[in-house]
């Protein structure tokens, strides 16, 4: 077979373009969980307690860190640690949205006054919904749940929202 230099260059160029196109598309659509992975720091956000006992302050998430770890192409696990909050939650990823399965929990400590006695109460939040929405290096969260403590004396329907960022390199 006798090929000219221009034929060889065109064939190599076409092969390289197909290779690069294939690599680019797999990282976007084939492994969406990889886009969530990294260390995220909350620039803003809070958990609003929404309890039957007045005066329980919101849990501020500002400055707290959430580490997101890729489990497989469509699943991530998260670890949110901060003052008064600890959450280890698993999510299913579709595109730029990750959704938590119900039945998972977060642990929060809250200062409360019950019967005139001030105390700190450990509260387990049962997660009803929790989504992570990714836009570049910004992650928005939205969570709803239910919680009880002190034998049902404290009853809450907490919500959370916030925005976290990571270094442009993906953290």
Q: Which role does the model predict for each range below?
A:
Residues 68, 87-95, 132, 164:
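Short, surface-exposed loop motifs enriched in S/T, G, D/E and P with embedded aromatic residues
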Residues 24-41, 167-171:
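N-terminal helix-cap/turn-to-beta initiation motif at the start of protein domains
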Residues 33-81, 109-129, 151-158:
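Short, solvent-exposed loop/hinge segments that bridge or flank secondary-structure elements
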Residues 2-13:
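Bacterial N-terminal signal peptides that target proteins for export
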Residues 19-22:
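C-terminal motif of bacterial Sec signal peptides marking the signal peptidase cleavage site
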Residues 40, 99-103, 134-145:
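A short hydrophobic beta-strand element
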Residues 95-97, 140-171:
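Edge beta-strand at a domain terminus
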